[in-house]
């Protein structure tokens, strides 16, 4: 069977499409991985997707994408992000399946909708809960050649293991660099012998690592599934990373500084409006602050799923000193860290009846039965 898989953002590509493509190939299917344009794209999605061992198309401009998709023929489509319009265009009269964490327009046009957790299902009509694909992606990391012993500066280090995640897009990593650098300076002054690690995403070019190495921030290129369980505490930003932390049982701090807002794109008509000189930035801040307010006080996935504070969060005018104090406070209470780990792992397995069958396997099994 020829299966079209469609996605756009970095997190969806690495955390969702990667395990789905892997499982489809195990089932003997031919896979067409179609990348859509995305305001959150890193610019290196195609390079990363080519590692998956399947045919890759896109990302293309809307006109070229429309013409190309109109000519493609597949037996079914799995939509893992992006507008359902594009998935329907590729599927034509074939079944269109969608996996999503929340409601999006056009879901009514899909043959079947899947989601990860019961809480996510509340806003998606008639969705099937199959578990989190991000969890499957972490398991794929464990199949890499490198092992936990190969952790760079952490290989023979018994101090506080704090790991920083700088973001999937280069402009966000540039902002993160100075913030992380200042946080590390404060922690070195306080702790003396401190060796941080910065886990670089697969979408970063190797040339970026030079600056981070020269600043003794110890950038590392390893799968999150390998490194996260080795960290005592992780500092990150809102996004898929917080689900990786949940599945790894990794305590940490999620930062959403106001100073980063201008680097976050706004899609659709709102995005066009925010490009207006001078006024645009204020409008963007207003739009993004409204989005944050709709999250009911939590910006990380574990806290939203549990509807309680599990991971630490700092939102707004965040200073390096604020973050450093939060890190020091967290690491001083080992009992609390153990409790956080337990809560995260409980959330990770919430609603699972059988860990032996992964989310990607359930998805592929469903498609096989529906398309004999």
Spans of model-derived segments:
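Nucleotide-activated sugar donor-binding and catalytic core shared by glycosyltransferases
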Residues: 1-372
